[in-house]
Amino acid sequence: MLKQRTIKSVVKTVGIGLHSGRKVTLTLRPAAPGNGIIFTRVDLDPAVEIPATASAIGDTRLASVLQKDGARVSTVEHLMSACAGLGIDNLYVDVDAEEIPIMDGSAASFVFLLQSAGIEEQGAAKRFIRVIKPVEVRDGDKLARLEPYFGFKLSFTIEFRHPAVDKTGQTFEIDFADTSYTREIARARTFGFAHEVEMLREIGLARGGSLDNAIVLDEHRMLNNDELRYGDEFVRHKILDAIGDLYVVGYPLIAAYTAHKSGHGLNNALLRALLADEAAYEIVTFDKVEEAPRAFLPQLQPAFS
């Protein structure tokens, strides 16, 4: 039986909120089978638990934001991406602010944190959402689509028309049947443009943004002194974001995802469209491990870790 996973022990870190610029303490705790991933605002009285679900995603303008009863947890996509990449089904995420710390702008710190806590299998079958007919959403020239595929692969195309981005490649495709999330995706950093950062700061946002946690571009070049972590780091980060955005559906997806200029909002609209059509998906488990898609096999976990 392919089993659910959680972490073995409690682990904690401190980082900076991207928009508030304030110190944020993040604590990850093991959770029981079937629990899912639950974010808790422990700084509120009483504390507010917000399950990571597609319907709980509210604001998507700058990040994926979970909302419940007026409480918010922003910028969840990088941590959710790491959980997807390591096959974590059940987890408590305690945070003492309204955003997850940005760390280095990628998912690498969260992968390290989860691996440091240890990952263990639980005595319940891992559940998947298998897409059985295509679902597509559009917004102008933007597109996001899920199609039947016995595995998990993603294809993403961006169009930024910037010298630094143009020369790195604007399309990337990855199939986790034979590719490592940790090696090929997790270290890709978020990116932005200097003039946009200044505009955000004028309205009280992006106060924690810096060259330490993002790739920053002016009109012509990259302002960071360090090299890109991948030759096509920009589009790989969009894949990283998409993996995190899609994981709030509640279970790993058995599907092929294709996107053109998609973002957090369109990714969430895609999940809602999928869940609204009961003929488009089914919930499945695998009693025999060898019958599961290769991307999710435990002995090949490094291929999706």
From Swiss-Prot:
This is UDP-3-O-acyl-N-acetylglucosamine deacetylase. SUPFAM superfamilies: Ribosomal protein S5 domain 2-like (SSF54211). Its EC number is 3.5.1.108. Catalyzes the hydrolysis of UDP-3-O-myristoyl-N-acetylglucosamine to form UDP-3-O-myristoylglucosamine and acetate, the committed step in lipid A biosynthesis. Pfam families: LpxC. Keywords: Hydrolase, Lipid A biosynthesis, Lipid biosynthesis, Lipid metabolism, Metal-binding, Zinc. GO terms for molecular function: metal ion binding; UDP-3-O-acyl-N-acetylglucosamine deacetylase activity. The gene is lpxC. It comes from Ralstonia nicotianae (strain ATCC BAA-1114 / GMI1000) (Ralstonia solanacearum). Zn(2+) binds at H78, H237, D241.
